[in-house]
Amino acid sequence: TINRINKTLLTQSEFKDRFKLIVVNNGEAINHPSGNGIIVINNENLGGSGGFMRGLIEAGKINDVKHVIFMDDDGSCEIESICRTHAFLLMAKDKNTVVTGCMLFEDNPAIIHESGAIWHRDFLHYPDKHYLDAREIDSLDTFDNERKIGYGGWWFFAFNINAIEYYSFPFFVRGDDLLFGYMHKKHNIVTLNGVASWQMDFERKISVLNSYLNFRTVAVPALISKRKFA
């Protein structure tokens, strides 16, 4: 992954010095030097949120960093998704603009898991365009239809670093990106055609602990919110 991004993005003349790749490695150290826009950070094994928050803290120490893209290490995306996101955020007038990438299934790459998600007043989140088949012509109108998004997953989540008001837990808690999105609900979260990531189907990760943590994630904003239940 490091070599691919370095070859196709960091060393390209039009993008050189515009991007930095921060790799937060949870657990055993990886043998890759930092330099030329690549920053390798060996971190304790604190899970996804721990890695993302460590990366966010380190990015904040770099003077010329304005935007950050969170990306899972077990997913994949086209370099074009990064380039489109960069171009869009450069033109955005609102610093609270966030770009979230559409998630598709890695074992069924034309099927959408979600293109952003929507918070309902029961405090559950509902994936937008869930199981839409991107190959079908009849699906294009639905896919192109913009909806008000309340949350974006960390498989591809780009934002202005100066617009962040709260940090997530510095250790793994399933659904941490849900809570992060709720805490920053004033953000204008948008989706873009051509910005996507392929991930493992979440149904393959179901467990008792994950189910508990998912419930906890939606229960917390329900308890602290002034909104009334339906």
Predicted regions and their residues:
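Active-site nucleotide-sugar/metal-binding loop of Leloir-type enzymes
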Residues: 53-67
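Donor nucleotide-sugar recognition loop
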Residues: 149-156, 165-182, 187-195
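Short, acidic, metal-binding catalytic loop of nucleotide-sugar glycosyltransferases
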Residues: 3-18
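Active-site donor/metal-binding and catalytic loop motifs
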Residues: 191-208
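Conserved donor NDP-sugar-binding/catalytic core segment of glycosyltransferases
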Residues: 80-126
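Catalytic core of nucleotide-sugar-dependent glycosyltransferases
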Residues: 208-229
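Short beta-strand-to-loop acidic/aromatic patch adjacent to the donor-nucleotide binding site
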Residues: 64-76
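A recurrent flexible, glycine/aromatic-enriched loop bordering the glycosyltransferase active site
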Residues: 130-156, 204-205
